[in-house]
Regions:
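Active-site acidic/histidine clusters and adjacent loop/turn architecture
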Residues: 114-117
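Catalytic-core region of right-hand nucleic acid polymerases
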Residues: 71-87
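Domain-length cofactor-binding catalytic modules of enzymes
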Residues: 2-28, 35-42, 48-56, 62-67, ...
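Loop-rich catalytic cores of soluble enzymes, especially ATP-dependent carboxylate-amine ligases
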Residues: 111
């Protein structure tokens, strides 16, 4: 474990390896008034992110909120459903491509599931018109779409059952909310040093915080519905399947900020994906307050996307995916190759105090779209 001290608090990092930029980003948080006396805990999958490290958790103890810390994919997570059996992968892949838009694409029309939730639909429309001042139609049509980058749809085999894992978030809707409120933070932040030198750490206060928290929760609901719609588009028996949702990039009811980290409350089921080749672990949380009742959300990147595309070869990517059905192994997704991520075992070695690993599931089918 590494301890990093700052003006307002200290951070504990649950790994012995930390890159310099990540260390700097953590120290910036510890020197930030928003985290005075806050318990800051960094998960073992930590790596530098846009303005803040991935794997960040902290108590929310003031009304000073930094939208950039929650990030742009608000409410992103993995919906995991236990399957009644394995589908034919070719047919499944064709159905996915027909029914679930990916990458930058949205649906041709608003999905019925959103129309069946008029309160959420109204809130999305309100945010688009009053906060984002943008066309609501595109965002509404994004419910039921996957996205690109590290988002995926995967079928994995466990000891007795197979599982469908759907990793997606709030799409461009969450991005626009994050960008809008971070701009408000920059415009209204009273800290001249932050405004001049570290705009990504400018914070909201008062009514602006309340407005952000309200709209962030709408984005979380958007993301949860998005994953659920994808599940129902892919499986005819979706309503009958046992499932659980594991969310990162949000502030939950326990008032813990989690960016690239998931809640691991006592008895709570969660999943930690590692990479396209090695699959995931299903865990039960221990509710360990020393970890802010949190767990890593994945293995964490060892290479930036740019570095991965420059240094990895398609041939080694293809070799690493032998035995896994995928029509997505290409130069366009090379930045998601297993070798671009940290060794999953090193991350799993550091989570036993916060979560019990109950099952390892291995991928037999994987779908990803380019960034």
């Amino acid at each position: 474990m590494i301890t990093i001290d700052g003006k307002y608090t200290e951070a504990r990092v649950f790994t012995d390896e930390l890159e310099d930029l990540a260390r700097t980003q953590i120290r910036d948080v510890c020197n930030h008034p928003a985290f005075e006396a806050s318990r800051v805990r960094i998960m073992p999958d930590v790596h530098a992110g846009a303005g803040c490290v991935i794997g960040f958790t902290a108590e929310l103890k003031t009304d000073k909120v930094i939208p950039n810390l929650i990030g742009v994919d608000i409410g992103c997570g993995v919906l995991t459903a236990r399957l009644s059996g394995l589908p034919d992968f070719s047919s499944f892949d064709a159905r996915l491509r027909e029914r679930v838009p990916s990458g930058m694409h949205a649906r041709p029309s608003v999905h019925q599931a959103l129309l069946d939730d008029p309160e959420l639909d109204e809130e999305i429309s309100r945010i688009c018109m009053d906060v984002l001042r943008t066309d609501k139609d595109r965002h509404r049509r994004s419910v039921g779409s996957l996205g690109g980058g590290n988002h995926f749809i995967e079928i994995a085999q466990g000891k007795e059952h197979a599982f469908l894992c759907i990793h997606s978030g709030s799409r461009n809707f969450g991005l626009k909310i994050a960008e809008r409120y971070q701009k408000i933070a920059v415009d209204t932040c009273p800290d001249a040093y932050l405004k001049e030198r570290k705009k990504g750490l400018c914070y909201l206060q008062g009514e602006n915080t309340l407005n952000y928290m309200r709209d962030m929760k709408v984005a979380q609901r958007f993301a949860a519905l998005n994953r659920r719609v994808i599940l129902h588009e892919l499986l005819d028996d979706a309503a009958d399947l046992e499932s659980f949702d594991t969310v990162h990039n949000y502030i939950a009811e326990d008032q813990i900020i989690r960016k690239g980290a998931v809640r691991a409350g006592r008895g709570e089921k969660l999943i930690v994906p590692l990479n396209m080749r090695d699959g995931s672990v299903i865990c039960i949380g221990k509710g360990n307050e020393e970890f802010n009742s949190s767990s890593p959300h994945g293995a964490g990147r060892s290479m930036s996307r740019k570095k991965a595309k420059a240094n990895l070869s398609l041939e080694e990517f293809e070799a690493s995916m032998q035995g896994i059905f995928s029509t997505c192994v290409s130069r366009a997704t090379l930045d998601e190759a297993p070798m671009a991520y940290k060794d999953g075992e090193s991350v799993l070695d550091n989570i036993h105090e916060t979560a019990e690993i109950v099952e390892r599931i291995r991928p037999v089918y994987n779908f990803k779209a380019p960034e």
